[in-house]
C-alpha cells in the first residue's frame, strides 16, 4: 500500500501548486486522497488519451498493476484499487477516535446506458459508485438529490455542494467529492488552558484566536536551513497523525511553500530528522471548510479530454458523448481540544524549554500513518 501513499503525496503538492495560483493568501483545505480515489473510479472506465492523461496527472502510471483490464481490477484483490478500498474502509469505518466521512459519487444523465460490469466494479471497490439521474428535464431536482446525498453522507456538515447554476439540461455527468473530518487527539489539550491570544496574520495585522496549549512529548524537528519547525501530533485512533509545518517568521510561509514537495516532506519527516522531545505546544482551534471547482483545477493540471467532447469513457457507457460536465470537491475539518488522555499541563514537565507556537500562518496535513497517504492538506493563514 505504500506506493499509494507516494502517489497521493506527489499529487497533493501538484494540486497545491495549482491552487496557490488562485488562492494566494487564503486558507486552503482539500483531500488529495479523496480526489485521487474518485479519479481512480473514473479511470476504471476511461480509454485512450482520456485514460493516459489521468494516469499521468495522478501518478497512477507509477503504481504497479493499476492499468490492468477492468475484469482483473474487479476480480483480483492484490491490486491498487483494492488497496485504495482497504485504506478507505479503514479510515471511514465507525470509530470513537475520529469521524471521517467521505461522499464520492458520479451522477450520469439517465439516457446514458451504463456498462453493467462498470457499475458492479465501482460498487465493489468504491462505495459511492455511479447513479443515473434526469438532468435533461429535471436538472434542479437532480441537483437537490445530489446535495441531499452529500449532506447525509457527511452527517449534515457539507451542504449545497452544487450551486444552482452548476447543472442544466445539457449536463452529461457530474462528479462530487466531499470529505468531513474531526479527530480526537491521543493527548487532549485541556480546555481551561485555552486562551484568547493574537494570531499574526501578517507583520502588520493580527486577530484574536482561541489558542490551545499543552506540554508533552512529541516528535519535532527544527530545520535551520529551511527556517521552519515540524511537529507531529498523533490522533487517538493510532492510524492517523497531524503534521504542522511552521515557518520561523511571520512572513515565512511563502518561502516554505516554494520549496515544499513530496521528496522534501518525506525527508523532513523521516525518523533520522524527527525526534521525540518534550515541547510546549500552542495550536489554534480551527474549523475550516473549503470548496473547489475540480473541473478547472484538473484541466490546468493536464486532464483536459475528460471534460470535453474528446472524452472517451466507453468503459462507463457505450454512448459516445459521455463526458464530465462538472466536478466539485469540498473539505471540512475541525480541530479542537478533545482527546483521549488528558495530561495535566502544569505537572507534565516544567523542564520543557522547547516551544512550538503556531501563532502565525502555517501548513498542516492529516496523514494515514501506515501508508503515508495524505488524507487532508491545509494552509492556515487565518484560523
From Swiss-Prot:
Major protein of egg white. It comes from the Eukaryota. It holds the Pfam family Serpin. One of its GO terms (molecular function) is serine-type endopeptidase inhibitor activity. PROSITE patterns: SERPIN. It is found in: Secreted. GO terms for cellular component: extracellular space. Transmembrane segments: none annotated. PANTHER family: SERINE PROTEASE INHIBITOR, SERPIN, SERPIN B4. Belongs to the serpin family. Ov-serpin subfamily. Glycans are attached at residues 293, 312. It comes from Coturnix japonica. Gene3D superfamilies: Alpha-1-antitrypsin, domain 1, Antithrombin, subunit I, domain 2. The modification N-acetylglycine is found at residue 2. Disulfide bonds join 74-121. The signal sequence is not cleaved. The functional signal for membrane translocation of ovalbumin becomes accessible when the nascent chain is 50 to 60 residues long. The hydrophobic sequence which lies between residues 27 and 43 folds back on the preceding residues to form an amphipathic hairpin structure which is the signal element recognized by the membrane. This is Ovalbumin. Keywords: Acetylation, Disulfide bond, Glycoprotein, Phosphoprotein, Secreted, Signal. Residues 22-48 form the signal peptide. The record marks 353-354 as: Reactive bond homolog. Storage protein of egg white. Lack protease inhibitory activity. The modification Phosphoserine is found at residues 69, 345.
Amino acid at each position: 500500500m505504500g506506493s499509494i501513499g507516494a502517489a497521493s503525496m506527489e499529487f497533493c503538492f501538484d494540486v497545491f501548486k495549482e491552487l496557490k495560483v488562485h488562492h494566494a493568501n487564503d486558507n486552503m483545505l482539500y483531500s488529495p486522497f479523496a480526489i485521487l480515489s474518485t479519479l481512480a473510479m473514473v479511470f476504471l472506465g476511461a480509454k485512450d488519451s482520456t485514460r493516459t492523461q489521468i494516469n499521468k496527472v495522478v501518478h497512477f502510471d507509477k503504481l504497479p498493476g493499476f492499468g490492468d483490464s477492468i475484469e482483473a481490477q474487479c476480480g483480483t484483490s492484490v491490486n491498487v484499487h483494492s488497496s485504495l478500498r482497504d485504506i478507505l474502509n479503514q479510515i471511514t469505518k465507525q470509530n470513537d477516535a475520529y469521524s471521517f466521512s467521505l461522499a464520492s459519487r458520479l451522477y450520469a444523465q439517465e439516457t446514458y446506458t451504463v456498462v453493467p460490469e462498470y457499475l458492479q466494479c465501482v460498487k465493489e471497490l468504491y462505495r459511492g459508485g455511479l447513479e443515473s439521474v434526469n438532468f435533461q428535464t429535471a436538472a434542479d431536482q437532480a441537483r437537490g438529490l445530489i446535495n441531499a446525498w452529500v449532506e447525509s453522507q457527511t452527517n449534515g456538515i457539507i451542504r449545497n455542494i452544487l450551486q444552482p447554476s452548476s447543472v442544466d439540461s445539457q449536463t452529461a455527468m457530474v462528479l462530487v467529492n466531499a470529505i468531513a473530518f474531526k479527530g480526537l487527539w491521543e493527548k487532549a489539550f485541556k480546555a481551561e488552558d485555552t486562551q484568547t491570544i493574537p494570531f499574526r496574520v501578517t507583520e502588520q495585522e493580527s486577530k484574536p484566536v482561541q489558542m490551545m496549549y499543552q506540554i508533552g512529548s512529541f516528535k519535532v524537528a527544527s530545520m535551520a536551513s529551511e527556517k521552519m519547525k515540524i511537529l507531529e501530533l498523533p490522533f487517538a485512533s493510532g492510524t492517523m497523525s497531524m503534521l504542522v509545518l511552521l515557518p520561523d517568521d511571520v512572513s515565512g510561509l511563502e518561502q516554505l511553500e516554494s520549496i515544499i514537495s513530496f521528496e522534501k516532506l518525506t525527508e523532513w519527516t523521516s525518523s533520522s530528522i524527527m525526534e521525540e522531545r518534550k515541547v510546549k505546544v500552542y495550536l489554534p482551534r480551527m474549523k475550516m471548510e473549503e470548496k473547489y471547482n475540480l473541473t478547472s483545477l484538473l484541466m490546468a493540471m493536464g486532464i483536459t479530454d475528460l471534460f470535453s467532447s474528446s472524452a472517451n469513457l466507453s468503459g462507463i457507457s457505450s454512448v459516445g458523448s459521455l463526458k464530465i460536465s462538472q466536478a466539485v470537491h469540498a473539505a471540512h475539518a475541525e480541530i479542537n481540544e478533545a482527546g483521549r488522555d488528558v495530561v495535566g499541563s502544569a505537572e507534565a514537565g516544567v523542564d520543557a524549554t522547547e516551544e512550538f507556537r503556531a501563532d502565525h500562518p502555517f501548513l498542516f496535513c492529516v496523514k494515514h500513518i501506515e501508508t503515508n497517504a495524505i488524507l487532508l492538506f491545509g494552509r492556515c493563514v487565518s484560523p
